[in-house]
From Swiss-Prot:
InterPro entries: FH_FOXJ1 (IPR047512), Fork_head_dom (IPR001766), FOXJ1 (IPR047513), TF_fork_head_CS_1 (IPR018122), TF_fork_head_CS_2 (IPR030456), WH-like_DNA-bd_sf (IPR036388), WH_DNA-bd_sf (IPR036390). Key transcription factor required for motile ciliogenesis. Activates genes essential for motile cilia formation and function. The keyword DNA-binding applies. The lineage of its organism: Eukaryota, Metazoa, Chordata, Craniata, Vertebrata. This is Forkhead box protein J1-B. Residues 124-218 bind DNA. PROSITE patterns: FORK_HEAD_1, FORK_HEAD_2, FORK_HEAD_3. One of its GO terms (molecular function) is DNA-binding transcription factor activity. GO terms for biological process: ciliary basal body-plasma membrane docking; cilium assembly; regulation of DNA-templated transcription; regulation of transcription by RNA polymerase II. Pfam families: Forkhead.
Length: 439
């Protein structure tokens, strides 16, 4: 029977003790690193990492690993330790760096000037479309360039656009149309070819080359010089017209206010001096100086002692049949006819034809001489001032005593003009029966 050696359990026990001690040490270091930063993106392990401590090619010793156990210290601490590209790079403890900084430093290893865009079809030029257009225009050394020439220059100098999708040409056209830095020049009639030309605005050339104008912007509203001058003239004319209108309105308002004050004073004076005129014709004072516009109506006031207060109220509108004899007989006492000598008979505003038949109770009355117009021009001028009053006066003269007519006597009848009170009324009461011949 084969006897097992007694040293084997001792070697296994020593190996297990060594493995357990190393495992506890690794757990302590891991817990300490976790306590520093719990983030998943923590790079704290880079501070303790050194490629000199990583024994990639170290094999386990025969004494310590006779049963196939491996020491944890021989494993690499990071994936970079097993990367052959990292073997020649020095790894020393330092501050952690971010991934973006690593990429920036990696890209910095390849300078932009070393890339040949003319032959490299995989790298897109780091220029905006507006900058490419500006570069093509400046390279042509011409004041204007066609769209096809811009395409040709870009494809000749940048290999990327020769192999890329041709949709970039749409972007070139959009930039030419929408960017205010480029101006379209129409083709002359005698120039061969088709299509227009494009040129760059000189004030934006430097900014384009510096990369400041990389966004599309709407072109500004450009007004033709002819339209601009017409607009300026129209605005100046409008300002003058508005100023003139304001001055005219202010002057008209001032004159109208003064005229209303004068007219109102004359109206009150006329009402106070001639109470009979206020009863017979409430608008007689307006016929002497008519307003250009009917702004207000004078109140019909009466200070005549012939009528009482109740009769004055009822006399506002004389409707129905009435008798002049009853009116004169009821109010004949206490009348001072000396006031009629100062009255003036106002001729009507409209010309009165001689064929007008003025008949009262079958007796014909001739028209006064003052009623006939002095001239056609004067009649036309007076007619245009107050048409409604002229119409009332004319209609009354044509139909003096129409039966069953419900009109306001104070608006249509003028007793002074009808009876010629200046000559007909006697100065004394003894001659009053002579008035009966008119009735």
């Amino acid at each position: 029977m084969f006897d097992l050696p007694t040293v084997a359990p001792l070697d296994m026990e020593d190996s297990w003790v060594t493995f357990q001690a190393e495992g506890d040490q690794g757990q302590d270091s891991f817990s300490s690193s976790v306590n520093l930063d719990d983030s998943l993106t923590s790079l704290q392990w880079l501070q303790e990492f050194s490629i000199l401590n990583a024994n990639v090619g170290k094999t386990p010793s025969s004494s310590g690993d006779s049963h196939g156990y491996r020491h944890l210290s021989g494993a690499p601490c990071s994936p970079l330790a097993a990367d052959p590209a990292c073997l020649g790079m020095p790894h020393t403890p330092g501050k952690p760096i971010s991934s973006s900084t690593s990429r920036a430093s990696h890209l910095g290893l390849q300078p932009m000037e070393e890339i040949d865009y003319k032959t490299n079809p995989h790298v897109k030029p780091p220029y905006s479309y507006a900058t490419l257009i500006c570069m093509a225009m400046q390279a042509s050394k011409k004041t204007k360039i066609t769209l096809s020439a811009i395409y040709k220059w870009i494809t000749d100098n940048f290999c990327y656009f020769r192999h890329a999708d041709p949709t970039w040409q749409n972007s070139i056209r959009h930039n030419l149309s929408l960017n205010k830095c480029f101006i379209k020049v129409p083709r002359e009639k005698d120039e061969p070819g088709k299509g227009g030309f494009w040129k760059i605005d000189p004030q934006y050339a430097d900014r384009l080359m510096n990369g400041a104008m990389k966004k599309r912007r709407l072109p500004p509203v450009q007004i033709h010089p002819a339209f601009a001058s017409a607009q300026a003239a129209a605005s100046s004319n409008g300002n003058r017209a508005s100023a003139w209108q304001m001055s005219v309105n202010s002057e008209s308002h001032k004159l109208l206010k003064e005229f209303e004050e004068i007219t109102s004073e004359q109206s009150w004076n006329a009402l106070g001096e001639h109470g009979w005129n206020a009863i017979s014709d409430g608008k007689s004072h307006k016929r002497k100086q008519p307003l250009p516009k009917r702004m207000f109506k004078a109140p019909r006031l009466s200070s005549s002692p012939m009528l009482s207060q109740e009769e004055q109220t009822e006399l506002g509108s004389l409707k129905g049949d009435f008798d002049w004899e009853v009116i004169f007989d009821s109010s004949i006492n206490g009348v001072n006819f000396s006031a009629f000598e100062d009255l003036e008979v106002t001729p009507p505003l409209s010309p009165v034809s001689r064929s007008v038949d003025l008949t009262v109770h079958g007796k014909h009355i001739d028209c006064p001489q003052q009623w006939y117009p002095m001239g056609q021009d004067q009649a036309v001028a007076q007619n245009s001032l107050d048409f409604d009053e002229t119409f009332l006066a004319t209609s009354f003269l044509q139909h003096p005593w129409e039966e069953n007519r419900n009109d306001y006597l104070s608006n249509s009848a003028n007793i002074e003009q009808l009876f010629d009170l200046n000559d007909a009324f006697p100065a004394e009461l003894n001659d009053w029966p002579a008035l009966g011949s008119y009735i």
